[in-house]
UniProtKB/Swiss-Prot annotation:
Function: Involved in the binding of tRNA to the ribosomes.
A Gene Ontology BP annotation from the UniProt entry: translation
Biological source species: Chlorobium chlorochromatii (strain CaD3)
GO molecular-function terms, A-Z: structural constituent of ribosome; tRNA binding
UniProt protein name: Small ribosomal subunit protein uS10
Keyword match Amino-acid biosynthesis: no
Length: 103
């Protein structure tokens, strides 16, 4: 029984359209190398809410809330070749997308 290798790529950004665009671009690159792809799998969106006082001195009841959401996508690549890894390393991702790669 052969051991299958896999690479997990997790993309994270505050802009969902940016994450989706780059997930599809990674999939297009990997499809050229005949590797098996699972994804993009949408992971749960985390919402962060921060509450601050509007005034620095008085009116404790007057507050303002700021919120932002972080969007994540997961891509799994089964049986990657050296060509697959080379093509993934050549991709230049924008600064708004955080990439985490595990093998």
């Amino acid at each position: 029984m052969a051991v299958q290798q896999k690479i997990r790529i997790k993309l994270k950004s505050y802009d969902h359209s940016l994450v989706d665009k780059w997930a599809l671009r990674i999939i297009d690159v990997v499809k050229q190398t005949d590797a098996i792809i699972f994804g993009p799998i949408p992971l749960p969106t985390k919402s962060h809410v921060y509450t601050v006082n509007r005034s620095p001195h008085v009116d404790k009841k007057s507050r303002e809330q700021f919120s932002f959401s972080s969007h994540k996508r997961l891509i799994e690549i089964m049986n990657p070749t050296s060509r697959t890894i080379d093509m993934l390393m050549k991709l230049e991702l924008p600064s708004g997308v955080d990439v985490e790669i595990k093998s």
